[in-house]
Amino acid sequence: MSQSYINVVGAGLAGSEAAYQIAKRGIPVKLYEMRGVKRTPQHKTSNFAELVCSNSFRGDSLTNAVGLLKEEMRRLDSIIMRTGEAHRVPAGGAMAVDRSGYAQAVTAELENNPLIQVIRNEVTEIPDDAITVIATGPLTSDSLAKKIYKLNGGEGFYFYDAAAPIVDQSSIDMDKVYLKSRYDKGEAAYLNCPMTKEEFIRFYEALINAEEAPFNSFEREKYFEGCMPIEVMAKRGIKTLLYGPMKPVGLEYPQDYKGPRDGDYKAPYAVVQLRQDNAAGSLYNIVGFQTHLKWSEQKRVFSMIPGLEQAHFVRYGVMHRNSYIDSPNLLAPTFATCKNPNLFFAGQMTGVEGYVESAASGLVAGINAVRRFKDEEAVIFPQTTAIGALPYYITHTKSKHFQPMNINFGIIKDLGGPRIRDKKKRYEKIAERSLKDLQQFLTV
């Protein structure tokens, strides 16, 4: 086995982060990426760290678990966080990016790093020539997936991810929508499409009766709750959308609103939000409207949304299969495999769910691949931190109940002592302790 470089397979969020962390520590990297020579069903470009589902890195507040994780990653010099900050677009209290400019910048930085050799080629075998980080993501090619499944005891776990449609801003009827962020948090960053009760019921009936695209015969429906198709969510009951992506709370009508409304109510019955998708503000995605409907049905049903009657859809919603391994049986909290300490996994295939979580796993895997390379003790971050709690959770939960997991305060080690009833204050205390413990851990 070579002791002159480390392999990273896959240049998505996790692989890009891992490659950067390895090179930053002075170790040469061979970074393999098949896009450029082989397409995937979901990606549109050959850029590294391409965002395929949404352009949002979610909430920024430290009272939000993903906000805490992002802050920890910033303190660990994450290329994904740093580049994301440089390509932010307005999104209220969330962090959203111009997905094209952001991905191009990550690609350029890694391609121009003298310690990183980019190899545009499909990897069909698990490399054994050097320490290796596999970060091929939910769209792992079939040939490599078969080899990974052998490690997985011949089992293949998966669920379905769906992406929301994107519309051309110039085709939105701006007289029917208004600009506002929920509860007026941050700047007014979302275009809101308000619905009366009658409009919502008409839309709901069309949605639950719309025709879905077919699954392959060997596939069955299995969804991750955080990226569930809007039509599947709707079929759980008419109120589901009103407490989910179409909830009107905190999105009251502006004073100059002249459109239809239910009596004297200050807020709509339901709201569809549109979020800016690029820096120029020429594209908007329909927030929370991941879908598996046929494209013709998407056009028909989503054109019922006020303001989108004449909308030009530059991308329809699509769905892909998202594979993940049995991390509780296969991985250590370092992201190395238990049976082969020279083989690491990172990203969504480990069972972490979300852009930020994927990048965080790549950061930890990259650091530990270097530690292995130098024959040093692996780093396991404290369970009191978000970046330590996530790998601990995916490697210690009961295998038969294992499902992909977003970061949340429920998996971070409890504060202990009397429980603080006020949720915001409790989360503030957890975040304060996390950042303090991380700083202490890094100085040691």
UniProtKB/Swiss-Prot annotation:
Report the EC number(s), separated by commas if there are several.
Answer: 2.1.1.74
* Cofactor dependence: FAD
Keyword tRNA processing attributed: yes
The GO terms this record gives for MF are:
flavin adenine dinucleotide binding; tRNA (uracil(54)-C5)-methyltransferase activity, 5,10-methylenetetrahydrofolate-dependent
Provide a GO biological process annotation: tRNA methylation
InterPro entries reported in the protein's UniProt record: FAD/NAD-bd_sf, MnmG-rel, MnmG-rel_CS, MnmG_N, TrmFO
Cellular location(s): Cytoplasm
GO-annotated cellular components: cytosol
* Short name of any one Pfam family annotated for the protein: GIDA
The family assignment reads:
Belongs to the MnmG family. TrmFO subfamily.
Q: What is this protein called?
A: Methylenetetrahydrofolate--tRNA-(uracil-5-)-methyltransferase TrmFO
Source organism: Streptococcus mutans serotype c (strain ATCC 700610 / UA159)
> Top-down, what is the taxonomic lineage of the species of origin?
Bacteria, Bacillati, Bacillota, Bacilli, Lactobacillales
Gene name, Swiss-Prot/TrEMBL: trmFO
